[in-house]
């Protein structure tokens, strides 16, 4: 048999084997091999054996790591090949110019570092190029995502910051944060992020917050209401102008991990450790649990309501002849779970599709503003893009988005353009009729991710 090793390599291998046998108390085998190879005690003494000790194990583990890396690269190559196979020159050109078809590139524009612990949450300012991140280091950091620079660090919470969100009345945008210290805090970006109010009331960690939208146009507008979700199993609705809790909603039987309001502020979608997704109707005096969706096999980490732009694609999954009216809300929704799956639901609580592909907990998801795609991130360190037009097929996987678990994902809200004037209305601030068209919203092709690796990454066109 012809050896593929050089004489020098063969000698090194023999010495490593003898050292391995000696270190594992197989002295007779080591002596027999030394004798057969002609390695006398003066040639292969104790010092030499010590030098080669552990070499076999190191080589073995290196091979295992290389095999895993090869498998990961093959998987990524297959995903890229699949994406290429599904693309045409026209679709590729369109993706580069049409914001409704934009998907993030594999490499981020910026990788921002300053936090000293896990980043749990991120939120974009609805107008400016600011983004906030909250961390287990108990701080909130404000960054300029266009320049990739840290603007300021906010220190006030005494426990990990679990969620952040921008919103509030037009002309009075606020930043809200919530924490394991049981409080919600409001910050004024126009006054150097001064803490203007602290909202106590929850009896356990406050895990999620969102400003309640005030219109169904899809614009980045919200009013004075804020909703929070907590480990105390309640949802609370707050008036940020007074700091009062207006409603407490009960129904979940375990930790509520996420909450998502509809564009018109009429509905809330919530989910958590009771493995249910619940839709609440806020249009009545006492909020009603309109739907309870059951299907996941583990805790549910995240949920989202689909924008009207997704209705044409999701209605086909639902078997509808035509999509619901764009003015309706809460027609379709998605949930991501520790069972590694994403589920799509309709307004009747029917499970439309289970998206399988992640290899670990699904931590966050967001619908593409263009409507065709759903994006998700996971503890498997990937970002996946699911094409709703192709029956929810995963058409793009970005591997190693972070070095460790990916914890959060947000899409920059669209920029509200000037509202169109109509024959019976004006665009100078005078009252308009209710039939007026909604203002146009320009999609910003910017997303951000945060991770246990303490890095905030910006993906932009």
From Swiss-Prot:
<keyword id="KW-0206">Cytoskeleton</keyword>
<keyword id="KW-0498">Mitosis</keyword>
<dbReference type="InterPro" id="IPR001680">
    <property type="entry name" value="WD40_rpt"/>
</dbReference>
<dbReference type="GO" id="GO:0005875">
    <property type="term" value="C:microtubule associated complex"/>
</dbReference>
<dbReference type="GO" id="GO:0000922">
    <property type="term" value="C:spindle pole"/>
</dbReference>
<feature type="repeat" description="WD 6">
    <location>
        <begin position="357"/>
        <end position="396"/>
    </location>
</feature>
<dbReference type="GO" id="GO:0051012">
    <property type="term" value="P:microtubule sliding"/>
</dbReference>
<keyword id="KW-0493">Microtubule</keyword>
<dbReference type="InterPro" id="IPR037190">
    <property type="entry name" value="LIS1_N"/>
</dbReference>
<feature type="repeat" description="WD 2">
    <location>
        <begin position="157"/>
        <end position="197"/>
    </location>
</feature>
<comment type="function">
    <text>Positively regulates the activity of the minus-end directed microtubule motor protein dynein. May enhance dynein-mediated microtubule sliding by targeting dynein to the microtubule plus end. Required for nuclear migration during vegetative growth as well as development. Required for retrograde early endosome (EE) transport from the hyphal tip. Required for localization of dynein to the mitotic spindle poles. Recruits additional proteins to the dynein complex at SPBs.</text>
</comment>
<comment type="subunit">
    <text>Self-associates. Interacts with NDL1 and dynein.</text>
</comment>
<feature type="repeat" description="WD 5">
    <location>
        <begin position="295"/>
        <end position="355"/>
    </location>
</feature>
<dbReference type="InterPro" id="IPR036322">
    <property type="entry name" value="WD40_repeat_dom_sf"/>
</dbReference>
<keyword id="KW-0677">Repeat</keyword>
<dbReference type="GO" id="GO:0070840">
    <property type="term" value="F:dynein complex binding"/>
</dbReference>
<keyword id="KW-0131">Cell cycle</keyword>
<protein>
    <recommendedName>
        <fullName>Nuclear distribution protein PAC1</fullName>
    </recommendedName>
</protein>
<keyword id="KW-0853">WD repeat</keyword>
<dbReference type="InterPro" id="IPR006594">
    <property type="entry name" value="LisH"/>
</dbReference>
<feature type="repeat" description="WD 1">
    <location>
        <begin position="114"/>
        <end position="155"/>
    </location>
</feature>
<keyword id="KW-0813">Transport</keyword>
<keyword id="KW-0132">Cell division</keyword>
<feature type="repeat" description="WD 4">
    <location>
        <begin position="251"/>
        <end position="290"/>
    </location>
</feature>
<dbReference type="GO" id="GO:0005737">
    <property type="term" value="C:cytoplasm"/>
</dbReference>
<keyword id="KW-0175">Coiled coil</keyword>
<feature type="repeat" description="WD 7">
    <location>
        <begin position="401"/>
        <end position="444"/>
    </location>
</feature>
<feature type="coiled-coil region">
    <location>
        <begin position="61"/>
        <end position="88"/>
    </location>
</feature>
<dbReference type="GO" id="GO:0005874">
    <property type="term" value="C:microtubule"/>
</dbReference>
<dbReference type="GO" id="GO:1990234">
    <property type="term" value="C:transferase complex"/>
</dbReference>
<dbReference type="InterPro" id="IPR019775">
    <property type="entry name" value="WD40_repeat_CS"/>
</dbReference>
<dbReference type="Pfam" id="PF00400">
    <property type="entry name" value="WD40"/>
</dbReference>
<dbReference type="GO" id="GO:0051301">
    <property type="term" value="P:cell division"/>
</dbReference>
<dbReference type="InterPro" id="IPR017252">
    <property type="entry name" value="Dynein_regulator_LIS1"/>
</dbReference>
<dbReference type="InterPro" id="IPR015943">
    <property type="entry name" value="WD40/YVTN_repeat-like_dom_sf"/>
</dbReference>
<dbReference type="GO" id="GO:0000132">
    <property type="term" value="P:establishment of mitotic spindle orientation"/>
</dbReference>
<comment type="similarity">
    <text>Belongs to the WD repeat LIS1/nudF family.</text>
</comment>
<feature type="repeat" description="WD 3">
    <location>
        <begin position="201"/>
        <end position="248"/>
    </location>
</feature>
<keyword id="KW-0963">Cytoplasm</keyword>
<dbReference type="InterPro" id="IPR020472">
    <property type="entry name" value="G-protein_beta_WD-40_rep"/>
</dbReference>
<feature type="domain" description="LisH">
    <location>
        <begin position="9"/>
        <end position="41"/>
    </location>
</feature>
<feature type="repeat" description="WD 8">
    <location>
        <begin position="446"/>
        <end position="461"/>
    </location>
</feature>
């Amino acid at each position: 048999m012809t050896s593929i090793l050089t004489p020098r390599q063969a000698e090194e291998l023999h010495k490593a084997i003898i050292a391995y046998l000696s270190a594992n108390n197989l002295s007779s085998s080591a002596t027999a091999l030394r004798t057969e190879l002609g390695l006398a005690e003066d040639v292969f003494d104790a010092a030499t054996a010590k030098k080669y000790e552990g070499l076999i194990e190191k080589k073995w583990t290196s091979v295992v790591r290389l095999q895993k890396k090869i498998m990961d690269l093959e998987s990524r190559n297959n995903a890229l090949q699949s994406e290429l196979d599904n693309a045409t020159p026209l679709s590729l050109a369109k993706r580069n110019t049409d914001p409704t078809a934009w998907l993030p590139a594999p490499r981020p524009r910026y990788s921002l570092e300053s936090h000293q612990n896990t980043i749990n949450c991120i939120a974009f300012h609805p107008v400016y190029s600011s983004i906030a991140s909250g961390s287990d280091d108990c701080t909130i950091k404000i960054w300029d995502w266009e320049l990739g620079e840290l603007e300021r660090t906010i220190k006030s919470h005494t426990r990990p910051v679990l969620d952040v969100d921008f919103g509030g009345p037009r002309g009075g945008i606020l930043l809200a944060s919530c924490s394991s210290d049981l409080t919600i805090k409001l910050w004024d970006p126009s006054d150097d992020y001064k803490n203007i109010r602290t909202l106590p009331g929850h009896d356990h960690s406050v895990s999620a917050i969102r400003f309640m939208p005030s219109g169904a146009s899809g614009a980045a507008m919200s009013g004075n209401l804020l909703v929070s979700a907590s480990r105390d199993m309640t949802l609370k609705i707050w008036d940020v102008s007074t700091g009062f809790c207006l409603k407490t909603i009960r129904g979940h039987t375990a930790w509520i991990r996420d909450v998502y309001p509809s564009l018109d502020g009429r509905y809330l979608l919530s989910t958590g450790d009771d493995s249910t997704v619940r839709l609440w109707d806020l249009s009545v005096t006492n909020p009603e649990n309109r739907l309870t969706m059951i299907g996941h096999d583990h805790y549910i980490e995240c949920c989202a309501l689909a924008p009207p732009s997704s209705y044409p694609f999701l209605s086909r999954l639902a078997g509808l002849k035509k999509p619901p009216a764009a003015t309706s809300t809460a027609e379709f929704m998605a949930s991501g779970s520790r069972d590694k799956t994403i589920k799509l639901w309709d307004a009747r609580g029917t499970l439309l599709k289970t998206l399988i592909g992640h290899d670990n907990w699904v931590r966050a998801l967001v619908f593409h503003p263009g409507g065709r795609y759903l994006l998700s991130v996971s503890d498997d360190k990937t970002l996946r893009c699911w094409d709703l037009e192709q029956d929810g097929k995963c058409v793009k996987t970005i591997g190693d988005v972070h070095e460790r678990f990916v914890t959060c994902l947000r899409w920059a809200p669209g920029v509200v353009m000037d509202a169109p004037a109509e024959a019976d209305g004006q665009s100078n601030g005078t009252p308009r009729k209710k039939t007026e068209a909604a203002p146009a919203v320009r999609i910003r092709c910017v997303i951000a991710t945060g991770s246990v690796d303490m890095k905030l990454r910006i993906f932009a066109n």
